[in-house]
Amino acid sequence: MKTKISALLLVLFIFSNNVFADFSVIGSLERKINSYIVSLQEEKDKNLKEGENKENTNETTNEENADEEVISENTAKEDVLKKPVLERREPTVSYSSLPNKSYGWYFRHPSKLNSGLPAGAGDVESSLVKKYNGIWQHPKDYKVVYITFDEGYEYNNNTTRILDIAKQKGVKFNFFVTGAYIKDRPDLVLRMINEGHTVGNHTNKHSNGPKALNVSNQKLINDITQAEVLYKNLTGQDFMPYMRPPEGAFSERELAIVRDLGYRSVFWSFAYADWDTGKQPSKSHALSKITGELHNGSVILLHAVSTTNTEILPDIIDNILKRGYKVETLDKIPSYE
């Protein structure tokens, strides 16, 4: 625009200095130049305004896109994490009014190995467990099994190997950890969560529930909630809503307290003597025992300290899958409530 204006001014200068120039022509030319300059300035202002509007529009669009990306990212994170939340209940009765008669969970082995027959349990014990929404096997005749590991302490780096096997086989397990285990092996607890396994409460000090209640109701509550605090400080989230009573010991009062704290008590329909690290069963005996008692809806209790369990675990999983069972997590078991 500057070049055009300079050229016009030069013409005006020549005319104004030419003695033969017609002054009326010069005046007319000057008016045209001024008009042209005004039109150029208006065009410049218009272009500048349109540019600013376009820039503002682009900025707004970019901001909106950025907001959408953040929302999308946050939604994705929420979908992946889906953090569990323990739902506490207000007691409907005084806990002290409930009996603290101690029971030891047990199940009846099938009469014949490899029969696929379900395990049995005591009528009183199983009725109490059901009354308080507990678990000991899937209530329906589904071809699924639930492999659970109790984690009181780490031994021989077995849990690392167990997690490696789960990843190799593409299955998920259910772990019950004590407060001591959380403090001792936070790395493995985090790995359990990150790899999609269920992690439940096994109390802080592995206390026998009815014995703790003989001291006070609060003693049992503290043992459960202290483990919760350790777990939440480490992971930033609650336990999954499952608790395994140490030693399989329980009472009606214990079951009520556990339920009101937001958990389902988890027992089992298969277990065997695998917990003594100095007296391990042979691999052939263990494999025959575990796979021989497979049945629909079985909740299998294994101890991670067992080196035998760890060594035969790939064969256990292969046998389970070959026979048409699915290996699932406890959240697939329906509630009784």
Residues of each region from the PLM?
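Generic signature of intrinsically disordered, low-complexity segments enriched in small/polar residues
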Residues: 16-18, 23-26, 39, 98, ...
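Short acidic/polar alpha-helix capping motifs at helix-coil junctions
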Residues: 95-100, 124-130, 149-156, 216-223, ...
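Active-site beta->alpha N-cap acidic-glycine motif
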Residues: 103-212, 228-232, 237-240, 326, ...
